Amino acid sequence: MNEQLQKESGGELAFKFYPNMVMGDEKDVIRKMRFGQIQAAGFTGFGLGEILPEIRILELPYLFRNDAEIDMVSEELYEYFSIALAKKGYVLLGWADVGWIYFLSNDPVAEPKNLHKTKVWMWQGDPLAEAFFKELDKSPVALPITDVLLSLQTGLINAVYCSPMAALVLQWFTHVEYISDVPFTHAMGAILMDKKAFEKIDASNQSILLEVCKSNLRSLVERSRIENQEAYVQLSMEGLEKVVSTVDQRLKLRLIGERVNERLAETLYSHDLLSKIDSLLVEYRKTDD
């Protein structure tokens, strides 16, 4: 992406990357963007929600059935969220993709009641996860993501949720025995740029930046999905046992998701936005079934 950006802008545009949380966690990065220390950054839904809470609607539990539904809704709402983020002082450069999120645990988790046997982690300060566990009447262990591995090692927690790739990269899989076969949500991400920094770029280069980022991020999403599929297989090869849910158990999970989605309407996002997404999915599924 950087090479293409430099080429098409005649060397006037380029990114300098700081990987692996060099600049701190997502809240730290947001703070540094506000002070002008960083001009652009990649965020998971957690960080995006700190900026624009309603964007977390794209990560509601059991909302999407497949990647195609995610792509359709994300594209339909791209302009909506671009405008909303601009009002907060950010430019949306493109969607990213963390992946489908599974439970990994030391006890099998096939349905909601199974979580009551676990000491399950919750990303500290995440209103979406908090609502999910509240609906289950389960008290999770709230921790920043940087404390999860040590907490697994010490036994403070024995269940986590993440994408297959994250389980491998963060080494969380080394302290659990099971992985669910049904993801409970999909985690999204995006690249944002400080609006003031963006507006300092001339109009022609703004167009180049937006086009290059969006197209390259689309390719990155496709690659990430393949890598997550491969990572799920790798986790099985590493000894994790897949927990297969029955049709009845899957239905229970979806009903939990629907209640959580309603619980968060008008606190995290509007009923109108939820209804719009529901309508988009209903129409899409008519043609897809």
Q: What does each model-identified segment do?
A:
Residues 1-69, 77, 85-289:
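N-terminal secretory/targeting leader peptides
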